[in-house]
From Swiss-Prot:
Name by which UniProt lists this protein: Glycerol-3-phosphate acyltransferase
Assembly, per entry: Probably interacts with PlsX.
Entry's EC annotation: 2.3.1.275
UniProt keyword Transferase present: yes
UniProt-annotated location(s): Cell inner membrane
Keywords recorded for this protein, A-Z: Cell inner membrane, Cell membrane, Lipid biosynthesis, Lipid metabolism, Membrane, Phospholipid biosynthesis, Phospholipid metabolism, Transferase, Transmembrane, Transmembrane helix
Membrane topology summary: Multi-pass membrane protein
Cellular component, GO annotation: plasma membrane
A Gene Ontology BP annotation from the UniProt entry: phospholipid biosynthetic process
Highest taxon above the source species: Bacteria
Family: Belongs to the PlsY family.
Mitochondrion as UniProt keyword: no
Organism: Prochlorococcus marinus (strain MIT 9215)
Function: Catalyzes the transfer of an acyl group from acyl-phosphate (acyl-PO(4)) to glycerol-3-phosphate (G3P) to form lysophosphatidic acid (LPA). This enzyme utilizes acyl-phosphate as fatty acyl donor, but not acyl-CoA or acyl-ACP.
Amino acid sequence: MNILIIFASYLLGSLPTGFLIGKYLKNIDLRTIGSGSTGATNVLRNVGKWPALFVFIIDVGKGFIAVKIAQYYTDQELIEVIAGISAISGHIWPIWLGGKGGKAVATGLGMFLALSWKVGLASLGIFLIVLTKTKFVSLSSISAAILLPIFMFFYLGEFIHTYFFISLIVALLVIWKHRTNITRLIKGEESKINQNQ
């Protein structure tokens, strides 16, 4: 059963929501324009506000549902977090798109909302605060990722815990996926949320 949960979580994460929206509404391949990501930000810049909101909600749901399914069928924390990371992996490296997907932010948020809604909401709050102040989605995502393990530590009260380790792994993964954004931020070349890349 555990193997089935993990495999199903990857397939769930692999659902190419942004790609399908781009194809259906504008007949464009998001992998070839803008940031090349199939996530909500690239949808916002190249398709529109409401399609981007739809993609964001679905992508959050992928991480959330994967963890909740695992929690329903098992009480093992390790399986819960593996299900979540499988959904994230599917989102980043979807089997249907040759391994070229999103950057894990929305699906990661969904995962942590399922593991601890307080930690998830705290991270979302940081994202929104930084976005409001700077208009940089990438900087907002990186800031939320950096603080995620800290929020998880305060929630748990300890470092030696499965949830803390997975929060650290996801944070590093999100930061790594934004490495080109970090370079552009340093050079002053990064696009703001209302600018096309």
